């Protein structure tokens, strides 16, 4: 049926993230089938209404944010949400977060659930969650920086070695357009740009505007 999936995650340069963000939002405004494949960034700042949600289990607050994109503009009937396990335990979720997420899912019992019911569930169980980091790259304009979407220490704002030649001719105020968050693992030995940003070596990280950053030899 000519369906072209849209990819949206945090490992794009700032300027490319803005383009992908707009493309996803605009696609859902059209009267055409659309498929968006996203990471946790879908929990924030995406003003869209989907008719099907397929998601890994997450913490309850995250699940409710994702469910908030389902049938946001009521289409005349309830829409389905499908959940599957996250086999990795650790960042960005602790084991207790995942267990609480499954507890939330089990309360649905294949029933029709409203946003009001989800909010009540959280209130009754008194689940305390840390607020997510401020989404600087969407709310603060491109002259700010890309803040982590989860707990501090999980990502670092960096530049890519493949961009350095181009970056060196820019004003410092323009550099954030080329920044992106990368995992803090394996950053030992990375050089710092004169602006203060770490530089991800090309032998470790490559980039394309359609797929984003990908780890060389990574999974």
Describe these PLM feature segments:
Residues 46-49:
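Conserved ATPase-coupling elements of RecA-like P-loop NTPase cores
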Residues 27-43, 55:
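Conserved two-lobed SF2 helicase motor
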Residues 52:
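Conserved phosphoryl-transfer motifs of two-component systems
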């Amino acid at each position: 049926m000519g369906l072209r999936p849209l990819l949206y995650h945090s490992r794009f340069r700032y300027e490319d993230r803005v383009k992908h963000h707009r493309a996803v939002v605009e696609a859902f405004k059209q009267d055409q089938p659309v498929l968006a494949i996203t990471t946790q960034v879908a929990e924030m700042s995406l003003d869209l209404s989907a008719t099907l949600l397929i998601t890994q289990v997450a913490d309850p607050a995250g699940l409710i944010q994702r469910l908030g994109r389902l049938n946001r503009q009521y289409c005349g009937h309830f829409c389905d949400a499908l959940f599957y396990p996250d086999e990795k335990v650790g960042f960005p979720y602790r084991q207790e977060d995942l267990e609480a997420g499954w507890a939330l899912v089990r309360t649905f019992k294949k029933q029709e659930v409203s946003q009001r019911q989800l909010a009540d569930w959280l209130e009754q169980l008194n689940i305390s969650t840390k607020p997510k980091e401020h989404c600087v790259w969407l709310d603060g304009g491109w002259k700010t920086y890309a803040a982590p979407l989860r707990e501090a220490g999980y990502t670092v704002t960096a530049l890519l070695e493949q961009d350095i030649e181009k970056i060196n001719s820019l004003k410092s105020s323009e550099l954030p357009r080329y920044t992106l968050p990368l995992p803090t693992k394996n950053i030992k030995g990375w050089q710092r740009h004169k602006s203060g940003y770490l530089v991800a070596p090309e032998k470790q990280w490559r980039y394309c505007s359609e797929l984003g950053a990908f780890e060389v030899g990574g999974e």
